[in-house]
Amino acid sequence: MINDMKIKFLEANCGDSIIISFVDDQGKIRNILIDGGTGETYSSKRRKGELYYVIEDICNKGQAIDLLILTHIDNDHIGGILKWFEEDKRFSSIVKNVWFNSGKLIAEYFKQPENP
């Protein structure tokens, strides 16, 4: 039973980026990140974006992103994630699981031709 849940929609310009945090049955805080918005959601030349600060906060608290969900590869959904992966080499130790909606991967899974 989840006792406490927070859902935050990050400032992502025209994109989407959502962080869901909750306390699981064992009292551990879990984090789910859905998409990463545009590249500027993580950082730009002039400033760090909201995604950057959310990730730093999670790391500083000794937590992880238990699940990263990438809904599709449009830049307004994946750009911030790509920027994060380029700039922060800790990502592989922070992200525990990834769900990626890829037509190619789904087609390979079902051994069907990819629908263009």
Model-derived segments and their meaning:
Residues 1-5, 82-116:
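Flexible, acidic/histidine-containing loops and adjacent segments that form or flank the divalent-metal
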Residues 2-61:
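Conserved beta-strand hairpin/beta-sheet module of binuclear metal-dependent hydrolase folds
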Residues 14, 73-79, 105-107:
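Active-site environment of divalent metal-dependent phosphoester hydrolases
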Residues 29, 47-98:
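Active-site metal-binding motif and surrounding structural segment of the metallo-beta-lactamase
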